[in-house]
Amino acid sequence: MQHLLTWHGHANFQIATEGANILIDPFFEGNPSAAAAWQGIAKPDLVLVTHDHGDHVGQTVEICRETGAMMGAIVGTAEKLAAAGVPQQQVLNGIGFNIGGTVLHNGVAVTMTQAYHSSESGAPAGYILTLPDGFTIYHAGDTGIFAGMELWGRLYSIDVALLPIGGVFTMDAKQAALACRLLRARSVVPMHWGTFPVLEGNTARFKEQLMNFAPDCRLFDMKPGETLTLETASEGCACD
């Protein structure tokens, strides 16, 4: 089974798989790295938000209202977004869910993980998505490295990890490379870099550190607007 992973810049990813189209941290307006407007992307049926900072909430309310997509977030942040205009009936699990919990959406199991960051409501989080054929994607959200990544790597067979490398507000390149080893990730897509001058400007240091800490982890060095075709571990991957 094939899955399509599109990076819209920063922490904004879209995953298209059989029966589901999932958008994570839909920061389009005000995102200098976004290659498209939210009105021009494929229609999502689920929007996931890792925490309530503006560069991650983005246009969640507008997208959910326009498309009818469900919205998933931690309890507290889900309440805040419902108050901001996401229709209550579109909130996943009615009130959101919490760290360690799993909800099902159109054949995709969405598991919430912890993240070490800040958030005005709820708590920051990440997501492990187990697609219908078992292919597994981890979106770390904004986080520093934490020892519990090793536990998630033992619990789940992570095919692709989406990890921040920008530093200052999240992990830097060295921490993210070690995170790949803790997670036992088969491949990694670096994110949360290059969007603003304060962040790491490119992936060069991460490439170097990945060779030191997790040389068997395959690097997909995506550019904003690029789509990656993902397949089962026995098959190949290709960038469009």
From Swiss-Prot:
Gene3D superfamilies noted in UniProt: Ribonuclease Z/Hydroxyacylglutathione hydrolase-like
GO molecular function, one term: hydrolase activity
Lineage top rank: taxon: Bacteria
Membrane among keywords: no
Protein keywords: Hydrolase
Matches recorded under SUPFAM superfamilies: Metallo-hydrolase/oxidoreductase
InterPro entries (alphabetical): Metallo-B-lactamas, RibonucZ/Hydroxyglut_hydro, UPF0173, UPF0173_UPF0282_UlaG_hydrolase
Stored Pfam families: Lactamase_B_2
UniProt record similarity statement: Belongs to the UPF0173 family.
NCBIfam families xref list: PRK00685.1
Stated name of the protein: UPF0173 metal-dependent hydrolase Dde_0151
Biological classification of the source: Bacteria, Pseudomonadati, Thermodesulfobacteriota, Desulfovibrionia, Desulfovibrionales
